[in-house]
Every structure is written in C-alpha cells, then in structure tokens.
Amino acid sequence: MNAIQDLTTKKSLDKITVDDLCNAAGYSRQTFYRHYTDKYDLVFSIYQQTLENRMEELDDYWDFDAHCKTMLACFSENRAFYKKAFTDSSFPSSFHDRFIEYSVRYTIEAIGKHKVNKDIQILIRCWVSNTISLVEQWTVKGMEKDEQWLVDMFRRLMPEEVKALYLN
C-alpha cells in the first residue's frame, strides 16, 4: 500500500500502472490481482483499511462527531494522496462512487438494516452523496474549514427521518 502512496508523489494516478505498483512493492501481477481488481480498488482499499483501523480505536459507543472526525482525519493526514484520488482524470468518479457505496452501507449498518426501508435508503444515499461532495471539495480546495465545521454541515444536511434513526 505504501508503494502507491510513494508513486503518487512522483506522478499522477492516471500514469501509474499495475506494473509500476508491482515493481515498487516487490509483488507479482498475479499477487496484485489476487487482492485487487485494479489500481483504483487498491486506492479505495487503503482508505477503507485506514478508516476501519482508526474506527476500532474509538470506544464501542456511538458518537457521530467522533466517527466523522476520524473519517476526516484520514483525509487530512494524507491530503495529497486523496486529492489525487479525487482529481486525477480517470479516477475521480471511481473513488467518489466507491466512497458513496461504502458510506451508504456503513450508515445502514449503523442504523440497523431492519429499520431502513426503501425511502430511508434513498434519503441516506442522497445525504451521503452530499457529504461526500463536501469532503471532496474540502480535500481538493485545501481544507480551509476545520473538521468541526464539516461535521456541523453533515448534521445540517441530514434529513430528519435519517436523524431520528441515526443520531438517537
């Protein structure tokens, strides 16, 4: 995983090939494809693993602000890497879309699948899409606002029906 982060300091994700990654990491293409479908899958896996490791550090109780700030810290600590993930021409929609799908699943699991009907799923997807767009803008434009401002915006964007299930 460090190989791709190191390579992105030298060239864009568009220009990095699976061969480049394998050479830098000392792995064969076969090993790479055993774990990842493509380089974009690797980038998202880095985010997902980093976030999940950080979330494990939180206490077992649910704290919306702490969970959001943990997610945002993943981006701020590796801003250059994630900025490229959001902006490189062949990758942004892939990372953005995977980020949305992961966050929708995470939100539904946090609420409890049995409490989420089709209408709530649509509201969650819309809310997640908006929050991901905010994270993307924040990452790409230099993180001018602090993390608490973003968390407050996430709350303001959340539909009341989702708040009732997610924040209580």
What are these model-derived regions, one by one?
Residues M1-Q5, T9, D14-V18, N23-G26, ...:
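An amphipathic alpha-helix adjacent to DNA-recognition modules
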Residues I16-T17, K83-A85, E147:
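Short, hydrophobic secondary-structure boundary micro-motifs
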Residues L21-V43, C74-T87, S93-I108, F154-L165:
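Basic/polar phosphate-binding segments, predominantly the helix-turn-helix DNA-binding elements
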Residues Q137-N168:
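C-terminal peripheral helix-coil segments that are non-catalytic and often amphipathic
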